[in-house]
Amino acid sequence: MNTDKQHLTHSLPCDAHLPVNHCNLPALILGSLTFQQHPVPLNLDGVKEMHIELFRSLETINSSKQRAESFQDYMRSAFLLDHLEEAGFNPAGRRRRDKADYLRMLRGWLFNSDGKEGAAMKSWVESRFGLRTLNHHGLLRDYMSEHYLAYLIDCAKALYNTNALNAQLDLLYTYCQYEIRRQYPSQQHIRLYRGINHIREHEVIRQLTKHDYVLVLNNLNSFTSNRERADEFGDYIMQAQIPLTKLLYTPGLLPASLKGEDEYLVLGGIHQVQLSFF
């Protein structure tokens, strides 16, 4: 691919996006460098409309902690998480999947983003935003490779016999965006850090200076706001201005269920980053 042309158009490589998604913007736009620099809200098709009563009730609650509690109560009710037999779950089944909900996916990701829960969340990003999974236990450029087959197997294991898991993640993203807009109404970006071992772990579109790169991130990534924390995960520190609209999860979003985690879950696409030693 002609990198000069790609830089001028700020477009994703063809193998990094799907032609369709379930979002108000196509992947080619939301995954572009222009979007990183000038973000706009991302809305998943029909999610807020379907759950409009939740968001109306949240408008009446001033405390973010109480809003989180209300959100989790709603999730339990809407997806029958406390009454899964009503959703068709068979407790006598050979494989128990009664705890495979959105919280299980988050905890699994935070423990190991290359595990089966991580695969399920990357698959969800593919479906909803059209950003392809580029790395899972290794690069996934070859769809006939063992790595890609292992990724598909992990997805199948994570999604098997779950209760509308993708719909749960849809609502998690929509709630996260609601909280961000409510708490930071005039802010568009947040400075975040990620530890890496080498820049070539990512597809580099262009090197602008010794430390500045334009590259393609995996479709879902962990970042932190703590530079020292990022240093624990690699020899180099990647710094980026991340659009708030690309956040699926932020620290403290669900304080009663996920305590002490300092990770931000960030949607991928093209980003301009700065690379440095600690």
Summary of predicted features, one role per range:
Residues 210-278:
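ADP-ribosyltransferase catalytic core
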Residues 72-76, 80-221:
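ADP-ribose/NAD+-binding catalytic cleft of ART/PARP-like enzymes
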Residues 1-98:
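Intrinsically disordered, low-complexity, charge-biased terminal/linker regions in eukaryotic proteins
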